[in-house]
Amino acid sequence: MGLGQLSAAPLPRSFFDRPSHEVAPDLLGRVLVHGPVAVRLTEVEAYGGPGEDPAAHTYRGRTPRNAVMFGPPGHLYVYFTYGMHFCANLVCLPEGHGSAVLVRAGEIVAGLDDARARRTPAAGRRARLPDRDLARGPARLAVALGLLREHNGLDAIWEGSPAALRPLTGNLGNPGDPGRSGHGPEHATWLTGQGPQHATWLTGLPHGSAAVLEGRPADPDTIRSGPRTGVSTAKETPWRFWIDGDPTVSPYRAHVPRRRSSAATSVGETPSS
């Protein structure tokens, strides 16, 4: 499936101004864009706020590390875990609530070559990765999208005219220099790694920005829910949501106790700070 088959209409901030366990299933089938890569979300997990969800980073209150989760809805909360991985969340509820949805897996619908180039070194092997594995799991998804510590707090809501945010295809110029004469449309993000002759530009989205697009919402009959992956508390809370039968969904793994520093907490572990 390509981006051209999906709606490029941006989701409004009000979409995220709800409890995370309501937002999470509605995110399935939506498209998260960052830079040249776009991912159709197929698996997510909801995390609640302070005093509500023992598995959430915000359970014990606000800290410098989780401060973005207490900010406005629709921003990216990106954190480092296990000393090696980044994971990305979308903040929910009004400012001050400390709730978010972890984006766990998805299908690359634009920027496949860029995603593959980012993932291959991380995979530590020369064999070609199957397309389904490029964003299969939260750390892999963050790598594919190029999300790092500096993107923590990035706004993923497009505030401009929805009509201005649309894909264009064809020979539109050099993807490395958008916005200049002869080099593609102004204020656009180049979304493929196949060269300008076959490029897709998402017009209206400044280069390097993020956005959540309408995509194609998952059929409710295909949505499944169950316990969250790897959490040691609130183990039975069914706030992991996925599209049944989609090959990009990551396998479920129960929590396995391990010794690690407090700085290397997993998605489902409450940080000690």
Model-identified regions with their sequence ranges:
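Conserved, well-structured core segments that form or line functional sites
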Residues: G2-G179, H183-S273
